[in-house]
Curated annotation (Swiss-Prot):
Outcome of swapping S591P: In PLGD; risk factor for thrombosis
Biological classification of the source: Eukaryota, Metazoa, Chordata, Craniata, Vertebrata
Protein's recorded name: Plasminogen
Glycosylation sites: S268, N308, T365
Family membership: Belongs to the peptidase S1 family. Plasminogen subfamily.
Site features described as Interacts with fibrin, chain residue numbers: R134, R136
Gene: PLG
Mutagenesis or variant effect for S741A: Proteolytically cleaved, but abolishes plasmin activity and cell detachment. Prevents invasion of the mosquito vector midgut by parasite P.falciparum ookinetes
Length: 810
């Protein structure tokens, strides 16, 4: 019984109806606390262990951990504020929230933080001390009031809040300045609001975050473990003006909630800078001119541009005067301009490069997921593994080794310089039984990675992995066989079914011919006198014969055993470059094997498409506007080059067209003959019906479209793009309400990354567990890779029922 059983026990307990006491704890799986003051007790369940922590009278129990294998309970006086957390199997650590919190609720009667100075800066006297003041309240007289050390407390329920006796003989006591918890109120824009309000400003009931009804959305709690998306409580996961929620009214997708502002000062946002560090959210300099030289509009002004980025709506962002700021998480400080024709622009802020930057500041907290589809493996205990897998056995993303969020740790590149602790890749720096990582889920400290152990014949990735290529299925095997009609056959059979030797393709005796020669068909493999199928004959490979009385005859080439290729699993590892189609990355050949080139009958590429089964291609309906006739189109499969097609490509006519009946921008093409599934031609997987891709999920687009003069034109290109929740995409400054529920947005709001003309109809695929799933069909956009204008894609999951019905009935 290992880690998974700890998880199972925890889930069973939380769902048992008796788990309410655990609401007062923060739990972390796979974490153990180094404790000096502790008790080891037997306990049959987590519930029993929690009860022992509550009942203990020898010391104040601030945390407990439960070991599932031994059914052992350890209650402890320490927590993460006073001790260190280490990684351990088969254990769940529970820490009381009240002792972790440094804020107060109400008058702070239950405050158990560690503030030990008054609001006037005087150090507090210890509660157990009698000097300089003899206390009325002490640990002996009030043992249940948490009178520890010299921490501020409120043992007498004073309406003014926590206080303490002071070390100043002239001042007996003074009040402490304790921050209000964001349970009954909010600081700033409520990004950390943790309360239970679940109605909107107009009184509508909130929809639960883990529900997709009545409104489908991308804020899935399991994908955003640090956003505290509990039940149907108002939250602010996307830098809105204040907490909000999706509503239970089908006619109102979302609305802001009416959360009062806290009366105490907000928490510190960290150091501020007069230069640009990161995205400049803490920039507090005085630059007030944009990159184009426009003067900034005052944040408090509404002319010439009306807006809601006001000092009142963003009280913690220092929107002073007309200085450039970044209140909403854009890529750099910006401002509205005084030019009525230019709503806003970024500002040119000098960089802080000369100042020291910590490793933690530079490290991304959740880098893009890079789990290989062509799964690599590890030898032994995996200490030598240097692959790029970055997901755990349960599908969680790995935390960067150089980051301390959400888990603080000592396994850093500096402390383990030879362990290959790069990015967030799975590693084994401490000789565990296999590669592992800290996770981006605050409640799960670490997990083993989703990697297999190498068999005796497999090679582990011990350096940055090269392109992984399987043998070309058209390469002659020992059996010298063919796929489909054998158009791609390149074997060395050279006799017909009757045993007659074949005539050389370059020869003109005994039979003269001019159509099928190495010169006229350079891509058909017309070598020597080998059997070939240059014209795609349904009878299979053939040749001109050496019998003067027989012009040609077929060859006896057996079919190859059908290869077993699962949907969504390319046999060449994709590059997964964070570049862009416009100015972006050339893909590894055949790493996106479902990519289709939709062409005119004359062979001109004009749209993309996606192979979803051997006989069916999905594309955009607007790609078929020029002609309703299937004969006007054909598809190319297995290509990397737009022109000068490779020998192995498959060219198939289209037999039928199916447009989505409600005129959405999606269409199905039925092929005249099934595609041959090879290592270069593999369908993408369809999503579950009505599945919603989580906000900020990293997905990929591919195509041969317009590259605006950048390198790699004519080769298949790829780009990695984050999905943007429709709620954000429909904001005024982005696509202003144009995106429908049957569509999704993806792109970098800073611009420079997008699909362009010629990519229409092509795939947007997202990696899930161990395969790529087709989530979008490239549909439309405002321009090409423009700032604040992400691309729009048809949401495939909304049409899966229609797609499957058409394929089943035709």
């Amino acid at each position: 019984m290992e880690h998974k059983e700890v998880v199972l026990l925890l889930l069973l307990f939380l769902k048992s109806g008796q788990g309410e006491p655990l609401d007062d704890y923060v739990n972390t799986q796979g974490a153990s606390l180094f404790s000096v003051t502790k008790k080891q007790l037997g306990a049959g369940s987590i519930e029993e262990c929690a009860a022992k922590c509550e009942e203990d009278e020898e010391f104040t129990c601030r945390a407990f951990q439960y070991h599932s294998k031994e059914q052992q309970c350890v209650i402890m006086a320490e927590n993460r504020k006073s001790s260190i957390i280490i990684r351990m199997r088969d254990v769940v650590l529970f820490e009381k929230k009240v002792y972790l919190s440094e804020c107060k609720t109400g008058n702070g009667k239950n405050y158990r933080g560690t503030m030990s100075k008054t609001k006037n800066g005087i150090t507090c006297q210890k509660w157990s001390s009698t000097s300089p003041h003899r206390p009325r309240f002490s640990p002996a007289t009030h043992p249940s009031e948490g009178l520890e050390e010299n921490y501020c407390r409120n043992p007498d329920n004073d309406p003014q809040g926590p206080w303490c006796y002071t070390t100043d003989p002239e001042k007996r006591y003074d009040y402490c300045d304790i921050l209000e918890c964001e349970e009954e109120c909010m600081h700033c824009s409520g990004e950390n609001y943790d309360g239970k309000i679940s109605k909107t400003m107009s009184g509508l009931e909130c929809q639960a975050w883990d529900s997709q009804s009545p409104h489908a959305h991308g804020y899935i709690p399991s994908k955003f473990p640090n956003k505290n998306l509990k039940k149907n409580y108002c939250r602010n996961p996307d830098r809105e003006l204040r907490p909000w929620c999706f509503t239970t009214d089908p006619n109102k997708r979302w609305e802001l909630c009416d959360i009062p502002r806290c009366t105490t000062p907000p928490p510190s946002s960290g150091p501020t800078y007069q230069c640009l560090k990161g995205t400049g959210e803490n920039y507090r300099g005085n630059v007030a001119v944009t990159v184009s030289g426009h003067t900034c509009q005052h944040w408090s002004a509404q002319t010439p541009h009306t807006h809601n980025r006001t000092p009142e709506n963003f009280p913690c962002k220092n929107l002073d005067e007309n200085y450039c700021r970044n209140p909403d998480g854009k890529r750099a400080p910006w401002c509205h301009t005084t030019n009525s024709q230019v709503r806003w622009e970024y500002c040119k802020i000098p960089s802080c490069d000369s100042s020291p930057v910590s490793t933690e500041q530079l490290a991304p907290t959740a880098p893009p997921e890079l789990t290989p589809v062509v799964q690599d493996c590890y030898h032994g205990d995996g200490q030598s593994y240097r692959g790029t897998s970055s997901t755990t056995t349960t599908g969680k993303k790995c935390q960067s080794w150089s980051s301390m969020t959400p888990h603080r740790h000592q396994k850093t590149p500096e402390n383990y310089p030879n362990a290959g602790l790069t990015m967030n890749y799975c590693r084994n720096p401490d000789a565990d039984k296999g590669p592992w990582c800290f996770t981006t889920d605050p409640s799960v400290r670490w997990e083993y990675c989703n990697l297999k152990k190498c068999s005796g014949t497999e090679a582990s990735v011990v350096a940055p992995p090269p392109v992984v290529l399987l043998p070309d299925v058209e390469t002659p095997s020992e059996e010298d066989c063919m796929f489909g009609n054998g158009k791609g056959y390149r074997g060395k059979r050279a006799t017909t079914v009757t045993g007659t030797p074949c005539q050389d393709w370059a020869a003109q005796e005994p039979h003269r011919h001019s159509i099928f020669t190495p010169e006229t068909n350079p891509r058909a493999g017309l070598e020597k006198n080998y059997c070939r199928n240059p014209d795609g004959d349904v009878g299979g490979p053939w040749c001109y014969t050496t019998n003067p009385r027989k012009l040609y005859d077929y060859c006896d080439v057996p079919q190859c055993a059908a290869p077993s290729f699962d949907c969504g699993k390319p046999q060449v590892e994709p590059k997964k470059c964070p570049g862009r189609v416009v100015g972006g990355c050339v893909a590894h050949p055949h790493s996106w094997p479902w990519q289709v080139s939709l062409r005119t009958r004359f062979g001109m590429h004009f749209c993309g498409g996606t192979l979803i089964s051997p006989e069916w291609v999905l594309t955009a309906a607007h790609c078929l506007e020029k002609s309703p006739r299937p004969s006007s189109y054909k598809v190319i499969l297995g290509a990397h080059q737009e022109v000068n097609l490779e020998p192995h490509v498959q060219e198939i006519e289209v037999s039928r067209l199916f447009l989505e009946p409600t005129r959405k921008d999606i269409a199905l093409l039925k092929l005249s003959s099934p595609a041959v599934i090879t290592d270069k031609v593999i369908p993408a997987c369809l999503p579950s019906p009505n599945y919603v891709v989580a906000d900020r999920t990293e997905c990929f687009i591919t195509g041969w479209g317009e590259t605006q003069g950048t390198f790699g034109a004519g080769l298949l290109k790829e780009a990695q793009l984050p999905v943007i929740e429709n709620k954000v995409c429909n904001r005024y400054e982005f696509l202003n309400g144009r995106v429908q529920s049957t569509e999704l947005c993806a792109g970098h709001l800073a611009g420079g990354t997008d699909s362009c003309q010629g990519d229409s109809g092509g795939p947007l695929v997202c990696f899930e567990k161990d395969k790529y799933i087709l989530q979008g069909v490239t549909s439309w956009g405002l321009g090409c890779a423009r700032p604040n204008k992400p691309g729009v894609y048809v949401r495939v999951s909304r049409f899966v029922t229609w797609i499957e019905g058409v394929m089943r009935n035709n």
